[in-house]
Amino acid sequence: MNKIALTLSLLGFLSPSQPETLYNGRRSVVMEGKVAQLVVDIGGGSIVSFRLNDQPTNPLAFDSSEFDPSEKALLRPLGHFLCLDRWGPVTEAEKQNGMFFHGEASRVEWKTIKPPTSEGDYIQALMTANLPLAGLEVKREIQLSNNSASFLVSEQVTNKNLLGRVYNMVQHPTIGPPFLNEDTLVDSNAQKGFMQTSPLPTPENPVVYWPNALKGTRFIDLRRLLDDSDPNVVSFTFEEHIGWITASSPSQGLLIGYLWDTQEYPWLNIWRHAKNGKPEARGLEFGTTGLHQPFPVLVQKRQIFNRPIYTYLDTGQTSKRNYLAFLFKIPKDYRGVARVTYEIGQLTLHERGPGSKRKFKMNTGNLPLIIKQNTP
């Protein structure tokens, strides 16, 4: 055994007793459907790959070690990672105690409770992770459709502390090249928003509306990223029960999208990063907060646009949230998504553009997404 393999073995990354396989040299859970493949990394729980079986492009091609050369940890954010117990920075005191930017969920080893198992219309896997500093436990159920390029994730967070606490939970899907390029289009039904660069205590001024942001006095269209990522983080709210976001890459012939209940995840946070004059990464982040600040600031601010910017979990309490992810093949002249409609078992994309009647439909099979009936 070479030195690298020995080190990984000592850290548990090559444990032969685990029901996982190696993907890019890392322990992973690989789920193989009839239409698509899904890969989850054990060293941080990130969804590192979601691709069609007959197409090599992986939209979630992101590694934090490439974005930040100082990031050398084996347990690190990749692809679509989970921000838990926070989104963004820690206080100086929390940093001294070892808490991470974006929380611990992508910095701990996850355990497989149930390896990928065929359950008829879908492949199911169960995973869990304990966050020792946060005092939280997260359990994840993944159902990959056998009949379409879609999967449903249900995550339960339990407060293991002796006291209740505030926390946040943000999904951080991150797209990268070659899927991400100058022709990649991001669409959403998001509405009212603000730039994270706007100063406290009223960062919600000035107000912007999707897909626009402001750079000085000039409007920026967030649908497309070219060579300038300023402003690099802009956050939005929703007026509909279902929130959705899509990223279309016509040159790659592929679209990735997410759909969720806006009562569970009321915020959409758009992160953009360009490098050497080209798009390098885009975060399509949906979650329980839209303010990229430590908890003392969140607690003082409380709400923005009448939406909460943190949530509370009592001792022993469990909270569950779901989302649906999907892939579509698209033509080279695709103009993006105007609207997404969803009924249990049926997902439809309506194309943008005047006079456009093209629709792309997907039967998600036995993957129901529970949408609450109350307004957000």
What are these regions (language model features)?
Residues 17-152, 163-376:
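Surface-exposed acidic/polar loop and edge beta-strand patches at domain peripheries
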Residues 156-161:
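Asparagine-centered strand-capping/turn motif at beta-strand->loop junctions
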Residues 7-21:
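Bacterial Sec-dependent signal peptides at the C-terminal "C-region" and cleavage site
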Residues 1-7:
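Sec-dependent signal peptide recognition
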